[in-house]
Amino acid sequence: ITALTAVPMGLETVNSQDIKVYNVSSEEYLAGSKIIDDLTPETSYRVSFYSGDEQSSDTYQARIEVKTTVTENLDEDYGTANRIDLRNEAFDPDYFNKLDWNSLAEGTTFVLPAGKTYVLNSGETVIEFAHSVHFVTPQTLEDYPTFSFDNAFRIVEGGVVDKVTFKRINLRASKSLSEVADNSLSGKQVICPESDVFLINTIDFTNCYIENFRSIVRSKKATGNVGAIAFKECTINAIGNQGIVSTDGKNGNYINDVSFDECTITNICGIADLRNSSSGKSISITNTTFCYAPMENSFLFRVDPSIAVKIENCVFGGSMKIDGKLPKFNELGSGGQDDYTGVYPFSSVNSFQANDRTSSKGNLGLSDSKMSTATLFTA
């Protein structure tokens, strides 16, 4: 490839001034990357690729369609008063373990450097949130930073936290997937308060890669409450037997609203364990793809019938294989359970399943894609 062109889509007539041409050097071609920085935000473009001295039908190779995003404005999104920009600081992997979290101002925003790994809650350290806090990586073409969890974030006793934000971060357990011995995986969570009384209004995950947790958010105590948990454009892989979000059995705590939008989710034991009637109001799953979910013989949902479950524009592959209690990642299992009770009245909209996906209990109401899991996810 020696050049590419970008043309705004939707034009009735394309003039020469509408066509942007970018030469591709041999170094850029070998790296597989060409940086373009003069396109209009929130605009769809048709990008065509050429090999040759001119851009013509003879040198045309391929094309794709892309949509640009709004340039991020940290000042507008998070304000300026309580921002800590770690891009300007000497890197310390234990930085967050050394902070006095009680002294942080409400709504403190940590701006993270690309490509760095921070170790969290290691040794005797336990980070407890007392205020709203935001962890944000600005738009970047570099690798996202990583949070490596030895243990979960917690909330101070009696704490009221309005919002916790994770944006463009790799969230991983410090224990590697190769060390997993059973379906609890790392045995850890991202957020798991131990306090008897707490309230978190919103937990927001945006464009994060999340891997190897027993659960991502778990509310354990009968008087602990989480208002809303949102996953947007996240990739979630390898979540254990507590499910992506969960409360502790039939205790009276609740996780009120859970949403997934434009996510890719693989190798999970289950989505939600919210079995108490006061556990919540709704679960919304839209524009999301699942494969190797749930774990073989495990449940995708364990929710009280009073909780509304919305599934729209989603695709589901087959279950994840298990050997005894050991998950076999990316291997197709014999089938799982859509619903632990078998009686939840699911009503999916424009959502499909692989023809080798089976449920021994419950029915999501998915349409048959007439394709196997292998065909769907390798096409």
Predicted feature residues:
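Recognizes extended acidic, P/S/T-rich segments that occur
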Residues: 2-40
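Alpha-helical linker/edge segments of TPR/alpha-solenoid repeat scaffolds
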Residues: 74-82
